[in-house]
Curated annotation (Swiss-Prot):
Stored InterPro entries: TatA/B/E, TatA/E
Family stated for the protein in its record: Belongs to the TatA/E family.
Lineage, broadest ranks: Bacteria, Pseudomonadati, Pseudomonadota, Gammaproteobacteria, Chromatiales
Residues passing through the membrane, by range: 1-21
Biased amino acid composition, Basic and acidic residues: 42-59, 70-90
Signal peptide residues on this chain, from the entry's feature table: none
Listed name of the protein: Sec-independent protein translocase protein TatA
Pfam families named in the record: TatA_B_E (PF02416)
Main location: membrane
Gene: tatA
Length: 90
């Protein structure tokens, strides 16, 4: 009990009458451009990923350096902020 060819033809004819050929052509052109842009972006992303893998190994793949037990050599990045002021001081 699928869609018969006659039913499909009638639906397409109604869509053509409602939207008109010019509007359907513009929508088709816009959809085609969007699909082409998406495919181009996917190709660029894959090429960029391949180049990135060849140029530099990631930091996670490098063997870890020996850690010092005293804690020397550890740096915490950030900005120093002022101490909060007491609002109730006289």
């Amino acid at each position: 009990m699928g869609i018969s060819p006659w039913t499909l033809l009638i639906v397409l004819l109604i869509v053509l009458l409602v939207f008109g050929t010019k509007k359907l052509r513009n929508m088709g052109t816009d959809m085609g451009g969007a699909i082409k842009g998406f495919k181009d972006a996917m190709k660029e992303g894959e090429e960029g990923a391949k180049e990135g893998e060849k140029s530099e190994p990631s930091k996670l793949e490098q063997p870890p350096e020996e850690e010092k037990e005293s804690g020397e050599g550890h740096t915490i990045e950030g900005e120093r902020s002022e101490q909060p002021r007491d609002r109730h001081s006289s």
